[in-house]
A protein has these predicted regions:
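Adenine nucleotide-associated cytosolic modules
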Residues: 1-275
């Protein structure tokens, strides 16, 4: 494919990077990323992936824009309150970059729908706000051999890890099962600083871009944590592979997708390793 003059100007800051260049930008334009959740994490990830020229971006979310979302979900505006989040997100992404094809899925992602959703995408971003969804995404991606980025946010903290099939532990290797209902506070209960979604969601977009380009080191085998109050990042090395993992281990016991009881959340952290 040949770039138009407008594309050469639009992506010029990418093209001059030796890690990207013309070849890398073509990879981005020919790639596809699915974002599950158009909230605090999915919003900044979607904006940066659209700006980067990722050719096809899917976005799945069943919710509508609420006024309380606007403190952190920067893809939506006051005029969008009451509108389906996927439609609001699509409009914002297409306004940034007309090169991008945005596919919308206004649906709850569950064991019946997720495999069809993820099958045609190169990389998955978990921007969900509850543990049942996070474990479902992990299990589906492991079974479908799809790479994905996990993240969670709460108060002034965030965490991030990346799974690539055959290259490191999955989410269940680290956190075997969802916590009991009400054992971990939600953002609705405990709060979240709005910019935290921007920090962590942007890092998820970066992981997707690096994976597509095949450059740099991904967070495979590591959990990255961030504390905004102390301005500390910690990169925690995880077990390379847990042979007894119930989903990706040598003898998996989870061979079908599970719909756990849903608890209302809006950004979650699990097992912050003593933080």
């Amino acid at each position: 494919m040949a770039f138009t003059n407008e594309q050469l100007e639009r992506y010029s800051r990418h093209i001059i990077l030796k890690e990207v260049g013309v070849k890398g930008q073509k990879k981005l334009l020919n790639s596809s990323v699915l974002i599950i959740g158009a909230g605090g994490l999915g919003a900044p990830a979607a904006l940066y992936l659209a700006a980067a020229g990722v050719g096809t971006i899917g976005i799945a979310d069943a919710d509508e824009v609420d006024l309380s979302n606007l403190q952190r979900q920067v893809i939506h505006a006051t005029r969008d309150v009451g509108k389906p989040k996927v439609i609001s997100a699509k409009e914002s992404m297409e306004a940034i970059n007309p090169d991008v094809t945005v596919k919308t899925y206004q649906t709850f992602v569950d064991s019946e729908t997720i495999m069809d959703l993820i099958k045609d995408y190169d990389f998955i971003i978990d921007g969900t706000d509850n543990f049942p969804a996070k474990f479902l995404i992990n299990d589906a991606c492991v079974m479908a051999k799809k790479p994905f980025s996990h993240a969670g946010i709460l108060r002034f903290q965030g965490q991030l890890m990346t799974y690539v099939p055959g290259e490191g532990p999955c989410y269940r290797c680290v956190f075997k099962d969802p916590p009991p209902k009400d054992a971990v506070p939600t953002c609705k209960q405990a709060g979240v600083i709005g910019a935290m979604g921007g920090v962590i969601g942007s890092l998820q977009a970066m992981e997707a871009i690096k994976y597509i380009l095949g450059v740099g080191d991904l967070l495979t085998g590591y959990l990255l944590t961030y504390d905004a109050l102390t301005m500390e990042f910690r990169k925690i090395k995880l077990p390379q592979h847990v042979k007894s993992c119930p989903v990706c281990g040598e003898h998996p016991t989870i061979t079908e997708l599970i719909d756990y009881e849903q608890a209302e959340c809006d950004g979650v952290l699990y097992g912050m390793f003593g933080e």
